[in-house]
Amino acid sequence: MSKSTRFALNKLTPPLELNMKQILITITAVLVVGCANQDIKLIQAVQDGNLEAVEKYLAAGMDVNTKDGYGATPLLYAAEYGRNDFAELLITNGADLNARYNDGLTALHAAVLNGSNEIVKLLIDQGADVNTKAKLKNFLTSKTHISTPLDSTIVSHNNIAHDLLRKHGAKTGEELKAEGK
């Protein structure tokens, strides 16, 4: 290749490192824009206990069932944090009662485990599945087992939720397994 041809090609094609820099900038921009889920603000407002912000975000049309990296929805966090008013508001706005964390636990599991018995009652009254099953892995034995909200009452010693769930037909994972469910 002649010297003049190489010179012409260099003028037409930017140096490789400049191309790579531009490619990396473009990829970064795409990732940032693609991953910037504005509805996460709704989850943050629930976690922060900011009911006014939750109301504002819902009124603005944010997705009531948005999920974070853990698979958690605003309702799951309301149950986990024992935020009754938030749970009522989210359910009124169409929150999925049976949404799951990535590990399979639901808002009913979370409310039971955290002693949020008003939310347990609310979820049951609104139609949450009292026999929903989560497949949990024991990190010590690497075995998996089925956990229902009733199983969670046993682990957390939550007798109030236990009685409430039993009254509404809840069963343990072992009971469901024995029934072939």
Predicted regions and their residues:
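Positively charged n-region of N-terminal signal peptides that target proteins for export
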Residues: 2-4, 17-23
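C-terminal motif of bacterial Sec signal peptides marking the signal peptidase cleavage site
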Residues: 33-34
